[in-house]
Regions:
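Asp-based, Mg2+/Mn2+-dependent phosphohydrolase catalytic module
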Residues: 1-9, 109, 118, 122-123, ...
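N-terminal helical cap/lid subdomain that shapes the substrate entry/recognition surface
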Residues: 2-103, 110, 122
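Short glycine/serine/threonine/alanine-rich loop segments
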Residues: 32, 113, 191
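Generic structural signal for well-ordered alpha-helices
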Residues: 102-105, 183
């Protein structure tokens, strides 16, 4: 087995509360099916489709237009699938556990590993999410889906990240993400994957064991 030389991190659900958990919790709050709200807002996340949220994450659509389209999808089913309300419902969540992941990423950098952030994200969120963690300190490479016009689980975004990192093979990389489909996509390329759950404990232990 190849020695790990680079660690790739997702953002949401790894350094911040998972938007997937947020969607499920929001669905429960409004009396709708949590899984249906998740799919209405974020689309079939195991795929890369033309759902409004996927187009938004590829930088093909403005946030306000994607939000309006998703609200209409929900309205057709009698569900208030408003992404803005979903994210507002997450605003006061805990941060302590995620500070532990930031500390672990800092330790990874200190041990000489190459690091990258590979995030499905939104142009309009760029300023706010970059204030949540010291990206320039923690990552040699930042790959934002809305900038590179491709999103996980498309394998092209992983190939692009490895090209930016330089002389590193997929088998020498470890990837942490809270979406199983993204982890599986990375693993198909030979990257070792760690699925991050909401309490982070298993992911932190796996990270320690593999490095």
């Amino acid at each position: 087995m190849s020695r790990i030389r680079a660690v790739l991190f997702d953002f949401g659900g790894v350094f911040t509360p998972s938007p997937f958990d947020g969607a499920r919790n929001y669905g429960a709050q409004i009396g709708a099916s949590p899984e249906r709200v998740l799919e209405l807002v974020f689309g079939p996340y195991h795929e890369d489709t033309d759902h409004p949220w996927h187009r938004l994450e590829r930088g093909e659509m403005a946030l306000v237009d994607a939000r309006n389209a998703i609200v209409e999808l929900g309205r057709a089913e009698g569900v208030d699938a408003d992404p803005f309300k979903l994210f507002a419902s997450m605003a006061n969540g805990p941060r302590g556990a995620y500070d532990a992941m930031i500390a672990r990423a800092r330790a990874v950098v200190g041990r000489g590993y190459r690091t990258a952030l590979v995030t499905n994200n939104v142009v309009e969120f760029r300023e706010s999410w970059r204030k949540m963690l010291p990206a320039d300190e923690l990552f040699q490479v930042v790959v934002d889906s809305s900038e590179v016009r491709m999103r996980k689980p498309n394998p092209a975004i992983f190939r692009h990240t490895l090209a930016l990192l330089g002389d590193v093979a997929p088998e020498e990389c470890l990837f942490l993400d809270d979406a199983a489909s993204n982890v599986e996509a990375a693993e198909k390329l030979g990257i070792r994957g760690v699925l991050v759950k909401s309490d982070l404990a298993d992911a932190l232990a796996a990270l320690d064991a593999l490095l």
